[in-house]
């Protein structure tokens, strides 16, 4: 069931990412410029009807990978880490669990709104390594895949 929902989400989100210059491949979108590559991925749970929304930032200057994927990114996190409060995060977990609660279309619409209002501005505001290092939205608990040290070296 989660793969069917993932496909519906991909269709709804496609025009938003296309407008940002992202290219779609499978359940992922990516775009790159000289300094950063940005990724967004929809991941279906193997054990339930939950869906995860992964975000990644890759520092191009490292040239570690020619075509980086979300797993290669130096900064990786889930979209709920962009939410402002514990209540918003709890509500998002309920939205992304398609085993219960609101009907599927209502959940998809709410998830689309969160992505438009939280992730799209994040991608729009973060275009350089300096933007990432100086951002209040980038939290210490987000997963840095050796990225913090690299970013600091690249920025200096």
Where are these regions (language model features)?
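Short, well-structured beta-strand/strand-turn elements
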Residues: 21-29
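Pyridoxal 5′-phosphate
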Residues: 17
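Intrinsically disordered, low-complexity regulatory regions enriched in serine/threonine/proline
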Residues: 1-8, 12, 31-156
């Amino acid at each position: 069931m989660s793969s069917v929902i993932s496909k519906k989400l991909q269709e709804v989100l496609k025009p938003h990412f296309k407008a940002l210059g992202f290219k779609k491949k499978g359940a992922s979108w990516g775009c790159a410029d000289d300094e950063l590559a940005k990724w967004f991925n929809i991941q279906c749970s193997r054990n339930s009807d939950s869906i995860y929304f992964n975000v990644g930032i890759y520092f191009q200057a490292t040239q570690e990978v020619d075509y980086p994927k979300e797993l290669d990114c130096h900064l990786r996190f889930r979209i709920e880490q962009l939410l402002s409060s514990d209540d918003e995060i709890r509500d998002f977990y309920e939205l992304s669990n398609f085993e219960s609660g609101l009907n599927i279309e209502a959940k998809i619409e709410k998830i689309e709104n969160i992505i438009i209002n939280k992730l799209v501005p994040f991608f729009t505001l973060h275009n350089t390594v300096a933007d990432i290092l100086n951002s209040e939205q980038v939290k210490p608990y987000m997963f840095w895949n050796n990225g913090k040290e690299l970013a600091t070296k690249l920025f200096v």
